[in-house]
Amino acid sequence: YDKENDTHINPYSDQAFYYITYGGDPGLRISPLNEPTGPGDAITTFNDYQFHEVDDFSPAKVGRRWFGNRFDIQDDQSYAFEFPNIVIGSDVEVNINVASASESATSMAVSLNGTAIDPINFGTISGSTLLSYRPSSQNSAPYIVPASGETVTVNLLYNNGSNPSSIGYLDYIRVGAVRQLIAGSEQFSFRYNLAATNFGIGEYSIASASQISQVWDVTNTTAIAAKANNESLNTLTFKAELGSLREYVAVSPQDYYTPVSVSDSGVQNQNIKGTIFKGEDGNFQDIDYLIITAPFLLQPAQRLAQYHIAQRGLKVKVVTLDKIYQEFSSGKQDIGAIRNLVRYIYENASAPENRIKYVGILGDSSIDYKNRLPGNNMVVPTFHTLFSSSTWTSYMSDDFFGMMGADPSNGNDEGLMGSNEKVDVAFGRILADDVTLANAMIDKIVNYEKQASYGNWRNNIIMVSDDVDIDWEFNKLQVTLNELSDRITLEKPFVNVKKIYMDAYEQQTSAGGNRYPDVNAALKNDIEVGALIVNYFGHGGEDGLAQEFIVDKDMASTLFHPGKYPLFITVTCEFSRFDNHTRPTAGEMLYQNPTGGAI
């Protein structure tokens, strides 16, 4: 179980890889268990847990929390967990995390071993809330029932609130129980939770242990120690200091796990750490700009790198994801590997002033790290929050990769996405999932920077404000934008600030709802004339800006102003989210327009 991700399943990969090599220095070895001397308190039980968790559905299409079993057609489902040699009468702890998508009030009835306990009640969904998520007992505390047998049965019955469109979802069930420390012919893991709070020496006693060859202390996976059962004793004992929680594995030669060799498992020698700072002459060279991409986009990535080397004199390196994963995450997909590469480059510059400044990601992204969704276009992963029930609380961001420094408030390294953290390296992303689109977006960059594209239009800034529907919006939207516009005019008098405040225009009613046709026309004209920046404050969604759609998908994809591409700054909601390939956004279309839209 991973507390940070609140899951028993790795969110990024279903496989773990280990490298096997030979020659060179000896690797780590398992050392004999160092047992304390003196009498010990007998420990004959251990804490075991099991879970049921399947990641098949992302109901809200936001965040990194996925769900398994659906409760719609089959609203009554049971799950059985077996605990051999359970201690009868001991506490069984059950955590149940579930969710509901319904515009009506719904609930989940829960019973453990046939005994009904408090139901889980869900709120309704509306607006930005797309899912009502509830951990067990409403506050993450486990249900506790006495053990009555070796089988623990959890039954869930979803009440859809008389709304046939309601759907319930199971995140996971986790069951913890106390078992007698009795072995068999299979290997098993064990821990004794009270060891963390007790003091002195504990003496573990494993019964029926004749087929157990060793017990490994795996608390520290880089310093494993073993207690051997060379004489095949039926009762195997060993001692350990109490005061901390320790993890053990009882090893049975009859139940060794067999590693699987994946197809094309050979890994070519590589050494990013040893070569990333080498220039063409073989000498040390700091890096200004790193481009990260997938192997199939290597050609356009190298083209972009060569352009910045030739035009800007930047020191640029291109690294593909497969190489990053091989060196920084043992071959599996993990967003931490990308950040660790950037941090390695950042920390090993010749001087602080020579640290890496820019990272460009060439490749689209998706909420689906594991390619479960048909047509998924995951190229380079991004960071997603654990919050997965609302577009208000969930977000994705590449900032995670660029937070390099130490957080002075808690002494921890940055990268936890806290509000007090700052980005130390500038990140950008080219949204492309094939070579053609990647090259088209690079063409856009090249054309934007050509001398022929320069002109007075780069002195123009367009400031756009949503209309005011609620009193507080006046200060937040129009007053704030007006103050910003006046400050720009004062400090940069050569800049032409064009204000487009929707409330200054006539609102019209159409079959599709309220609209501002004059705002659409003015904004389209000003963009095509040319503007360095378009700054928008207000509401927005995947289909456009403002409820009146002053920029919609059609406008975003048909704007035509080659070379004169503005930087769009939108202080709004999910206008430019790019992680759901089943619903392209207006912001994506604005960016991917090859002859217009945003740079």
Question: Where do the model's predicted regions map?
Answer:
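Cysteine-dependent hydrolase recognition
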Residues: Y1-I599
